[in-house]
Structures are given as structure tokens and as C-alpha cells.
Swiss-Prot record:
Residues noted as binding acetyl-CoA in the record, renumbered to the chain: A380, N386, Y387, S405, A423, R440
Pathway(s) of this molecule: Nucleotide-sugar biosynthesis; UDP-N-acetyl-alpha-D-glucosamine biosynthesis; N-acetyl-alpha-D-glucosamine 1-phosphate from alpha-D-glucosamine 6-phosphate (route II): step 2/2; Nucleotide-sugar biosynthesis; UDP-N-acetyl-alpha-D-glucosamine biosynthesis; UDP-N-acetyl-alpha-D-glucosamine from N-acetyl-alpha-D-glucosamine 1-phosphate: step 1/1; Bacterial outer membrane biogenesis; LPS lipid A biosynthesis
Region feature (Linker): 230-250
Chief location of this protein within or outside the cell: cytoplasm
Subunit structure: Homotrimer.
GO molecular function: glucosamine-1-phosphate N-acetyltransferase activity; magnesium ion binding; UDP-N-acetylglucosamine diphosphorylase activity
Catalytic activity: alpha-D-glucosamine 1-phosphate + acetyl-CoA = N-acetyl-alpha-D-glucosamine 1-phosphate + CoA + H(+); N-acetyl-alpha-D-glucosamine 1-phosphate + UTP + H(+) = UDP-N-acetyl-alpha-D-glucosamine + diphosphate
Enzyme Commission number(s) from the entry: 2.7.7.23, 2.3.1.157
Active-site residue list: H363 (proton acceptor)
Name of protein: Bifunctional protein GlmU
Amino acid sequence: MSNSSMSVVILAAGKGTRMYSDLPKVLHPLAGKPMVQHVIDAAMKLGAQQVHLVYGHGGELLQKTLTDPALNWVLQAEQLGTGHAMQQAAPHFADDEDVLMLYGDVPLISVDTLQRLLAAKPQGGIGLLTVKLDNPSGYGRIVRENGDVVGIVEHKDASDTQREINEINTGILVANGRDLKRWLSLLNNNNAQGEFYITDIIALAHADGKKIATVHPARLSEVEGVNNRLQLAALERVYQSEQAEKLLLAGVMLLDPARFDLRGELTHGRDITIDTNVIIEGHVTLGDRVRIGTGCVLKNCVIGDDSEISPYSVLEDSRLDAGCTVGPFARLRPGAELAEGAHVGNFVEIKKARLGKGSKAGHLSYLGDAEIGSGVNIGAGTITCNYDGANKFKTIIGDDVFVGSDTQLVAPVTVANGATIAAGTTVTRDIAENELVLSRVKQVHVQGWQRPIKKK
């Protein structure tokens, strides 16, 4: 292996016709982010000095979606093959760097495999990622003489004898920038497809006396590409199965690994239990002994020790201290914070609000733009009226406050410690400490009331 720096080229110019979509193929999501983003992330983890993204179809949308300033955008106006794509990027290659070639629609390539490929590359030669298949039909074959790689022949151009070869080209390779630029300049399109094949550089390198080293990926799924939605769905299942296996081996109890989706990163403590059909998005941290019920969605959350999220609750950009309970059917929106032992029950929505230690909102309530103290009881149907149609206002509730059912708190308003709000009250003014507040229409009784009769 050379000691030179390394850059990466990601080919992402294809139309993806078989996806039957207006979305560029490489932007279709896998595990919650675009396919090509998985490849970009791998390149960054490798320590690439620069990442060149070769684009064509849907370039404007690609650039709008992939906002990493480290990307160097290279246009391939016509799709004339992989060799042609690399020719567009070649002017950006430094002579003394290694250039690693990856694909935007091969999303599961691992950093470990790429590190082995870089390590195996001979000084001045080429590192080539290959696999052996029981049925290699349709793939380029690795041609060897006396064990040494001398070329790659595409399936359509292969002889009957060459088609018996079961070692195939994955398309992933690494070579020196100076040599690669020269070989790319020598490519032609005299083949059955009429395209410029990057694979032809293998024969050119052999003719120059360069060594070609091969490496196999740890798993076949690492080099499987996506051309249609069926293949994308299959790779999604492969990815999720791998993530579930890692979590199980790390001590997380997934009650059904086949019905768990990780679409981000999960940091966890000990003795976690996750029921079926749970989705984890973004960055989620679970403390010790956390229990997640079936059908929950957690995105960018921190969940404290001994907390429980009951079924079908949705939490986003929220933070729970130890011993909290949420749900079932609760929604915590961005900015929701629950102090130790707080409880949020069914059909309660919290947004940009903090619920203090031991406080409870059990049923059918909306708490937005609020600061709620400790030991507070929020009755069913309580609403913080935080929006006047133009601006948001805050509700402040002190400690040990009792809020009766069907209460409306019209912000901005402050409720002091120990206050009691009777059921059905609309609060429009601040409430002092230990006050009882109620606002109701006087109850009227009409004896012998006759209900209206429906006209026939």
C-alpha cells in the first residue's frame, strides 16, 4: 500500500429508469437516508481528502439534498459508461494520491472492507474488489493467467470459456491518480455496449507491468447494487437484520428482530426491551432498563433510566429523565422535556414544554410553550392556548398545582404554587399562590323539559 493521500469518486449519474420514479435513484432512502449518503459517509470515515460526486440526472435535486460542503460536484452530461464518468472526474485527481472508485447505488459497502482494499493495493498497482458467485451471469469476469489478474471482460463481450469464470468484478477499485488519468485517456468504446468501460484499465495496467491485487468483501450484500425497488427493499431488510443482530449481541432485547427499524444511531444502556414495529430515527439514547412498547417512533430523543414508552407513542427531539412514563398514544414534539417520574398519558401532546418532577398529564391534553413545576396534576382535556394567530405565548405553572378537567389556559398566564383550578375553567389572568379559581356559567335546571320532535 502506498503512503499517499486518498480521494474518492462516487458515480451517481444514472437515471434509475427501473425505479419508475421522478426521484434520482441514488436519493431513494435506505434506513432513513439517501442511498448515496451511506456511500458518502463511508468515504468520510475512510478519511478521504476529497469526495468527487459524478452526477447527471436530477443534478439540481441532488445538490439540494446533499449539502455537505466537502463534496466536489462533477457533471457527466451524457451517460457513456463508467469509464466516461471517471474521465469527467480525472482532471481533479492529484498525481500522488490514491483514487478510490465507489457507486452511489451500492449503499452497504463497509468501511472495514474498503480499508482492507486500500491496504492490499500494491505500490503503483490496482486494488480490485471481487466476489465469486454460483451464477455470475450478467457480470464482468475476472480474467487471470497463472493466478494473476490480467483483465476484466464484460458478460456481453465474453467468450463461452470466459463465461465459465465465477469470479466477478464489483466495480470498486483503487489506483494511483497519475496512472489512472493516463489509463482513462486510453479508453475506447469498441465493445458491444458502445460505452467506455472503466474495467478496461485492468488490461492497460497489466500491460504496464502493474500488479493487481484482489480483495473479497466480508458480505455479498456490501457490493449488491440497486436498480429497482425490489432490490432496494431487499437491501433494507439486510441492513435492518444486521443492525438488529448487533443490538441483540450487545444486550438489547428486541422481541422480534424482523420487526424493528433503525434509521439512525442508537446508544443504549443495559436491559433494554423493545417490542415489535418500533422505529428509531436520528440519534436516540436509551438509559438502563428502558422499555419501548409496540409501534412507537423515537427520533432524536434521550430517554432516562427506568422509563417506559407505551405502545403507539411518537417522540421527537424530546428528553425524559429517569422513571418517566409516556403513552399509550402520546405525542412528544420538539422541545418536550419530562423531569424525573413525570407521566404523560394517552392522547396527550406536548410541544416546547417542560413537565416537572412527578407531574402528570394523564389524558386528552395539549401542553405547548409551557413551564410546569413539580407535583402538578393536569386534568383531562386541558389546553394551553398558546397561539393568537400570529404569535406564541408561554404558560407558567408552579409546583403542586391542581388543574381540573377541561381547563383552558390562555397564554401568557402564570399559575403560582399550590393553586387549584376547577374543572371547566378558562384562565385569562394570573393566579396567586394557593388560590382556587373557577369560571363557569351558572347551572340551570328546567323541570319537565320537552325535547324537540323531529318533523316527518
